[in-house]
Curated annotation (Swiss-Prot):
Pathway: Amino-acid biosynthesis; L-histidine biosynthesis; L-histidine from 5-phospho-alpha-D-ribose 1-diphosphate: step 6/9. Pfam families: IGPD. One of its GO terms (molecular function) is imidazoleglycerol-phosphate dehydratase activity. HAMAP family: HisB. Its main location: cytoplasm. PROSITE patterns: IGP_DEHYDRATASE_1, IGP_DEHYDRATASE_2. GO terms for cellular component: cytoplasm. It catalyses: D-erythro-1-(imidazol-4-yl)glycerol 3-phosphate = 3-(imidazol-4-yl)-2-oxopropyl phosphate + H2O. It comes from Clostridium botulinum (strain Kyoto / Type A2). PANTHER family: IMIDAZOLEGLYCEROL-PHOSPHATE DEHYDRATASE, IMIDAZOLEGLYCEROL-PHOSPHATE DEHYDRATASE HIS7. The lineage of its organism: Bacteria, Bacillati, Bacillota, Clostridia, Eubacteriales. GO terms for biological process: L-histidine biosynthetic process. Its EC number is 4.2.1.19. This is Imidazoleglycerol-phosphate dehydratase.
Amino acid sequence: MKESIAKVYRKTGETEIKSEINLYGEGKYDIKTGIGFFDHMLNLMARHGLIDVKLEAKGDLQVDSHHTVEDVGIVLGESFKKALGDKKGIKRYGTSFVPMDEALASVSIDISGRPYIVCDFNFTVDKLGGMDTELVEEFLRALAFNVGITLHARVLYGKNNHHMIEAVFKALGRALREAVDRDEKINGVMSTKGTL
């Protein structure tokens, strides 16, 4: 599989983020956002998606983690979009169900060029490791809208909030891997319109 590398740099009054990804990597990661729990989740996404991710984010964490988490989603979304290029030969769709002990999550993706997100999960704590749990959806929204994908994420059941969120991020990585996988039998893009 050939490499598909993209670099993105973004600086605002709230954050400064630089990323480099290889969609067809080995799942290597070097991620530093200043939010330990978020780093852990992004590491899982990269590893289980076999996507190489190098990312450094500096944000206004003295305020809270919202801007950093959302802007990381924006930058990773832009990186994925850039790395996908013309989307020729990709399978387009990806779905993954991932168990994490008592929790089960699913993520389904359509690299359609039409950004949309549906999240169906309810966490029972407000924070995990310095990250507001409501920011899981904010991250997924920023990612989906900046790649241009339809993304459905669901926790079917679970009790431990860490396990539920971990299952979502692992499923995200695996669904991305499936959707970006290239098939030599696909001539052009996987659409009757001829474009994605």
